[in-house]
């Protein structure tokens, strides 16, 4: 029955990731994303949220529900900036690119999995790299956002005219391998909390990437 339900919808493309939305650990991450506020920084004097979209379309639905007047819509956009919305598939990319995981002697999580594509990477994330609900706390969420900031910074570094480093489709490979190498070079001791507190990476780290 479960397999039938996965392919019953012929009007919209349904991904396997859509059927994991009710995973307790993902629900817990969603809870933290709604109440953990980003720190005030010199660049932004307002605390905002990083919106974890556990189920497809959540952000758009909530924005429509709460933004029924222009002022409320503006308030929603300030609280939940679109650039700080991320899906569970994106979360899997951010975390798997940074952290290698072994299952026995087999390397089951790493950049080599990220580059295989979103669905394969997400499946590995769910099987090997999503913690039990008891291990998901504020620190886990803040670290996850720091990894998101790192990934976005590297992605921008290698993919815009401004950066001067446009490398086309190679970016999909270079970004995860760069971040994995960074973690190895720093022996896993890069200060992720500092990235969370600043809400961006330092110029020195950006130049290194």
Task: Tell me what each language-model feature is.
Residues 200-204:
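Phosphorylation-prone, low-complexity intrinsically disordered regions
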Residues 2-195:
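C-terminal catalytic or substrate-handling cores of phosphate/nucleotide-
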